[in-house]
Amino acid sequence: MEFLFLREKAPFACCVGEMGFALRYCGAGFCLRRAERGKAGMFRPFFVSCVESAKGWGWLYVEKVVFAKHLFVLKRYFYERCALAKKGRYAIPERKNLKEAIMIDFKVDESLCVSCGACVKDCLHQALRMDMYPVMVDEGHCIRCQHCLAVCPTGAVSIMGTAASDCTPLAGNIPEPRQLDTLFKGRRSVRHYKRENVSPALLQELLDSAAYAPTGSNAQNLLVSVVDDIAAMDAFREAVYLRLDELAETGAMPDCQRRAFFLSAGKLWKAGGWDGIFRSAPHCVIVANAKNATCVEQDPLIYLSYFELMAQARGIGTLWCGLLYWCLRDVLPDFLLRLGIPDTHQLGYAMLFGYPSINYRRTVETRSALVRHIGWN
């Protein structure tokens, strides 16, 4: 994931002090500062749905150890501490690539290591070699995939500040195939939602799970923008339809996919509140990828697939929103910056989500894909 500073003149003031940062992290915009009330040593983040409409505090206590991890990354992420942040005005300093920012810090507990060489064998770019025990010979070749940590049979390896004791063992914790199969078959596109915010804790759980989605070359350059509040979503929705109506009325609608739909969408919204794009969803998540990423188009789709499956497993409805994607890409690209997507990133896709107002009772039958079993002589 990439950190994105809030735009200059963001309409709130905080984070000038111990942290000195206002940032977006893992797709949820927030800044951390010491809580004025509450448990000693705790912090509260300020969630914002849009960098230009930050209102009110969203309360969530963060344990010291979690805060320390954020600070660990921040200290290594910027060439200079953000002394530029003053009185609520934030400039964007020169940034490092996040992969380069986190120290590799490869360590082996020799009392646990059995010198099996599994970590060396599985290292894609041969950054490790055996010298009685595994050693890191070229940090420049390490892509931070952490396979060495995952494959070690005795838990002797730690890397990037993470040890085996910090991880979840796979044995006994993988869902039964039948359960996964039911989840896949029971996944439905949801177009009817309750007018209710998804709880911040649950939303963060979904984002944390989706962060494990693979990216090409382990680039991890995705940028995730989340509209996590109904009021912000209503404002976003209204702005989209009013702009579409304006373009239709002035004859300025560009040639684009689903142009006929966009020509009428704004008028139908103004006439009777017909929400053909957003389906009255309370939230949306929009994923972009760095334009220089290895798999610029594929990575966002994989991320959203992870997000969707975890969401539906937790009772949250989702909808792949091609209409919003086409609208932002082809008709309203100027909205991207307001959604926290800079020119360095390419729009990947959009997904609506929220508590469903309709319940599906069973799986359905679907047509199988055309499969060809290939022999090669």
Predicted segments, located by residue:
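Tryptophan (W) side chains
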Residues: 57-59
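Acidic, surface-exposed loops and disordered segments
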Residues: 96-377
